[in-house]
């Protein structure tokens, strides 16, 4: 093939055989046996091939569903501990997508039901991270909704159908992809019924939202405005079937352990009754493992809503050892992230083991779980990250326990010189 530019080697005007543009309208015209193709058509062909290859890869990965053990193994790379929750989630997600792969097969008279998931665990125990990692692993659209912003239709606040709209936005309004996605609804415990007794006042952000979510979670056809527009009667709506969308609801459920303990420690009355001490109470995580649907109803979820979430997974409180592991072991561990930031400035960052212990202790004191680790490290490293880009001679930064406690500054090691550490400023 030859490259023809501007017709200099021939007086005849040449045209692209595909788009019909002349050689003067394009940058380059490539000649073949009695045919010509321009650079624009070559780019277009490359785009088409690239899209088809990506779609084929996505389809092949969708058909190859990892086993529960493989799913749990991948979760291990990102989430520390919570083995029981990982096992429950792995089996539930595997069965859900296995059900979707089988739904189009003819002659199968057994219809498999959907098993939505309820995650119960303290703040910062890894509920959201588990859901995010699952969606990334399965290559499906994923969105997070905050239950506290939802209200019944017709009231100020977000409509429950906005959840599906967010899911559509994640996959460029591809309805087929959205119908295979995962929705994580956070803070689900905050929409619990305000009182056990029916009230004259309408509870539009509590029981009202639970009622509105019922059909969405179980399976309905939701009408969603295209491209995020507002609803009006003359508008065309996108119809999204939610039967095959996996809903994962998560919440801290503060106080649920007391409901469980009251149920499990009820004794008889009289001289023969067993006397039980209040001090014999279990840890929150241990109590939550014994949760039953009735406990959730007493907490404030309506029975119908609890019934739509048949898979229960409880997460344990993170102890000091687990928090130290979270700081160093996962693929995207915080210490690795900050080390990478310093590496971009050609500086090594070292955390001593006593520093990691001090960070874990502080996070436990704040009762924020793993979520509090980043804010602690950010505060400790703020001044250093401010100064380092201006000090090209620094080669290493060392963080020990005293730095975390605020009694000294990080140790700075300079090239071809002695290490220096400034005293911590007086409070």
From Swiss-Prot:
GO MF, one example: zinc ion binding
Gene3D superfamilies tied to this protein: 1.10.8.60, ClpX chaperone, C4-type zinc finger domain (6.20.220.10), P-loop containing nucleotide triphosphate hydrolases (3.40.50.300)
CDD domains registered for this protein in UniProt: RecA-like_ClpX
Source organism, top-level taxon: Bacteria
Family: Belongs to the ClpX chaperone family.
Subunit structure: Component of the ClpX-ClpP complex. Forms a hexameric ring that, in the presence of ATP, binds to fourteen ClpP subunits assembled into a disk-like structure with a central cavity, resembling the structure of eukaryotic proteasomes.
InterPro entries linked: AAA+_ATPase, ATP-dep_Clp_protease_ClpX, ATPase_AAA_core, Clp_ATPase_C, Clp_protease_ATP-bd_su_ClpX, ClpX_bact, P-loop_NTPase, Znf_CppX_C4
All residue ranges annotated as the ClpX-type ZB domain in the record: 4-57
Name by which UniProt lists this protein: ATP-dependent Clp protease ATP-binding subunit ClpX
Annotated binding of Zn(2+), by residue: 16, 19, 38, 41
Any single GO CC term annotated in Swiss-Prot or TrEMBL for this entry: HslUV protease complex
Function: ATP-dependent specificity component of the Clp protease. It directs the protease to specific substrates. Can perform chaperone functions in the absence of ClpP.
NCBIfam families: clpX (TIGR00382), PRK05342.1 (NF003745)
Keyword Nucleotidyltransferase: no
Organism: Pseudomonas putida (strain W619)
Binding positions for ATP per the UniProt entry: 122-129
Keywords for this protein: ATP-binding, Chaperone, Metal-binding, Nucleotide-binding, Zinc
Gene: clpX
GO biological process, one term: cell division
């Amino acid at each position: 093939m030859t490259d023809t530019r501007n017709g200099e080697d021939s007086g005849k005007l040449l045209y692209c055989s595909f788009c019909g543009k002349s050689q003067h309208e394009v940058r380059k015209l490539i000649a073949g046996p009695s045919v010509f193709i321009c650079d624009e058509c070559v780019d277009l062909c490359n785009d088409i091939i690239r899209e088809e290859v990506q779609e084929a890869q996505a389809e092949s990965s969708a058909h190859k569903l990892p086993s529960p053990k493989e799913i749990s193994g991948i979760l291990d790379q990102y989430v520390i501990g919570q083995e029981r929750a990982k096992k429950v989630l792995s089996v539930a997600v595997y069965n859900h997508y296995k059900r979707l792969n089988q739904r189009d097969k003819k002659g199968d008279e057994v219809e498999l039901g959907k098993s939505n998931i309820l995650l119960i665990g303290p703040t910062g125990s890894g509920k959201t991270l588990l859901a995010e990692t699952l969606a990334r692993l399965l290559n499906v659209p994923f969105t997070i909704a905050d239950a506290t912003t939802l209200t019944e239709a017709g009231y100020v606040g977000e409509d429950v159908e906005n959840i599906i709209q967010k899911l559509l936005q994640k996959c460029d309004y591809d309805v087929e992809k959205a119908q295979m996605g995962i929705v994580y609804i956070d803070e689900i415990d905050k929409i619990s019924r305000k009182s056990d007794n029916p009230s004259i006042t309408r509870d539009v952000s509590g029981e009202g939202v639970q009622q509105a979510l019922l059909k969405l979670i179980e399976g309905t056809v939701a009408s969603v405005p295209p491209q995020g527009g507002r609803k009006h009667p003359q508008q065309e709506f996108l119809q999204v079937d939610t039967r095959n969308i996996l809903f994962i609801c998560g919440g801290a459920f503060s106080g649920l352990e007391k409901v469980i303990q009251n149920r499990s420690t009820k004794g008889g009355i009289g001289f023969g009754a067993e006397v039980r001490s209040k001090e014999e109470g279990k840890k929150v995580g241990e109590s939550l493992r014994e949760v039953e649907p009735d406990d959730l109803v007493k907490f404030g979820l309506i029975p119908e809503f609890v019934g739509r979430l048949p898979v229960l997974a409880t997460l344990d409180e993170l102890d000091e050892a687990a928090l130290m592991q979270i700081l160093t072991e996962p693929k995207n561990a915080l210490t690795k992230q900050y080390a990478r930031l310093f590496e971009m400035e050609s500086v090594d960052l070292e955390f001593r083991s006593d520093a990691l212990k001090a960070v874990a202790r502080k996070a436990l004191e704040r009762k924020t779980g793993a979520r509090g680790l980043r804010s602690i490290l950010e505060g400790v490293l703020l001044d250093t990250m401010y100064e380092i880009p201006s000090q090209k001679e620094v080669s290493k930064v060392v963080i020990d326990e005293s730095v975390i406690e605020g009694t000294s500054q990080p140790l700075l090691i300079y090239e071809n010189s002695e290490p220096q550490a400034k005293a911590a400023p007086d409070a």
